[in-house]
């Protein structure tokens, strides 16, 4: 497969991944499928939305910073069997931006999983308060809340917020890994296309 077809395949593959990352990040603002938590965030000193959600890892990092490079990479691959040297060179830079964005999304998703959601829970004094009850354990160890579903009922509100966050942040984590791999591969593909030139239908170099 020549470099142009590879670029086209990578560009097309990145589109749904970027869109999915944007959707996941937007959904995270509405735990329990309710708008009141995002509207009440920071009112009265209470944070009702998980901090990692507000970092916009999926929206900006895995979304916009991957979607824009995907458009260029896809366009580069449309020019015959493979793109021209200049286009392939530029695709390396765009793919690098995609790597940075997807890594940012990956890191934020990891933090979101490790720290756990912001929710209403009972503190040590049996008072209901907004906070992050699972944040004390910051490692994916056996004691992590991720491996202890029975502890998820610590969160009183939003309803089922732990499951909600775990599912969406896990999806963002997987999307970030796939985007990073595809963008990194395009950097290598673009380098070959830039150095070796373009190929036409009959395998001729331009």
Q: In which residue ranges do the predicted regions lie?
A:
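Signature of small four-pass
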Residues: 2-125, 172-195, 200
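Extracellular/lumenal N-termini and interhelical loops of multi-pass eukaryotic membrane proteins
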Residues: 37-39, 114-159
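Individual transmembrane alpha-helix segments
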Residues: 150-177
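Non-transmembrane, juxtamembrane loop and terminal tail segments
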Residues: 202-206
């Amino acid at each position: 497969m020549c470099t142009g077809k590879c670029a086209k395949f990578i560009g097309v593959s990145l589109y749904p991944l970027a869109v999915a990352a944007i959707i996941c990040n937007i959904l995270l603002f509405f735990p329990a499928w309710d708008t009141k938590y995002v509207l009440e965030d920071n009112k009265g000193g209470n944070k009702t939305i998980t901090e990692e959600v507000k970092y916009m890892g999926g929206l900006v990092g895995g979304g916009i910073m991957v979607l824009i490079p995907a458009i260029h990479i896809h366009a580069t691959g449309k020019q015959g069997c493979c793109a021209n040297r200049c286009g392939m060179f530029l695709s390396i830079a765009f793919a690098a931006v995609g790597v940075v964005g997807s890594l940012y999304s990956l890191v934020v998703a990891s933090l979101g999983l490790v720290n756990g959601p912001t929710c209403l829970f009972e503190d040590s004094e049996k008072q209901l308060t907004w906070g992050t009850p699972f944040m004390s354990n910051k490692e994916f160890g056996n004691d992590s809340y991720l491996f202890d579903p029975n502890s998820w009922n610590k969160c009183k509100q939003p309803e089922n917020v732990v499951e909600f966050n775990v599912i969406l942040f896990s999806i963002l984590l997987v999307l970030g890994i796939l985007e990073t791999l595809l963008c990194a591969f395009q950097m290598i593909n673009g380098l070959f296309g830039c150095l070796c030139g373009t190929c036409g239908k009959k395998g001729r170099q331009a």
